[in-house]
């Protein structure tokens, strides 16, 4: 008799990735875990959009961000954290695109931000980028009007500046990089807790 062929077990179809309906936040990443300098001024939390939520210092944007933070001496600070936001309508990023073998645990922004603030206990929060600043602070002004001001974010002092990706594509990089440097210095001078 001819050999019998057992039909292959059907493979469950993988559901297509669903677009996010609300702003989402990835877990905070410890930027400089090997830093051995003093934690002067307390922990930092940086919020921005990035195509590398688990490795935010990757790529040209990450390289510029790293240079900005190093200029401020934060590469020696043991408590610098960064969390990436994703806009509504964005598809969840595949792990390999995120520079990690682990999936990105995107969570709705309000709950994840509250959890991140509670966990990190930042002395200051730096909001980079117009949409990030407007969404987190629930404001409508452009970055140019929000920068060089102190905001309260659930009891934590917060400051706003330009996103590194904007600095790479603007036609006036010197102007905006100088303003961003001033904003970083402003953020570094913020008291640990917002009044």
Regions found by a protein language model. Give the residues of each.
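A polyanion-binding, active-site-adjacent surface
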Residues: 1-195
């Amino acid at each position: 008799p001819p050999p019998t062929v057992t039909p292959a077990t059907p493979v469950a179809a993988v559901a297509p990735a669903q677009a996010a309906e609300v702003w989402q936040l990835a877990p905070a990443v410890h930027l400089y875990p090997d830093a051995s300098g003093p934690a002067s001024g307390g922990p930092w939390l940086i919020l921005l959009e990035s195509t590398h939520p688990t490795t935010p210092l990757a790529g040209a944007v990450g390289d510029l961000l790293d240079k900005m933070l190093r200029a401020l001496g934060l590469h020696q600070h043991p408590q610098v954290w960064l969390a990436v936001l994703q806009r509504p309508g964005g598809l969840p990023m595949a792990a390999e695109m995120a520079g990690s073998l682990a999936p990105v645990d995107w969570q709705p922004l309000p709950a994840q931000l509250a959890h991140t603030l509670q966990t990190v206990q930042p002395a200051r929060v730096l909001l980079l980028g117009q949409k990030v600043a407007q969404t987190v602070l629930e404001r409508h002004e452009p970055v140019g009007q929000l920068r060089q001001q102190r905001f309260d974010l659930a009891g934590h002092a917060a400051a706003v500046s330009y996103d590194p990706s904007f600095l790479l594509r603007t036609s006036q990089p010197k102007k905006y990089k100088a303003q961003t440097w001033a904003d970083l210095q402003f953020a570094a001078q913020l008291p640990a807790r917002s009044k």
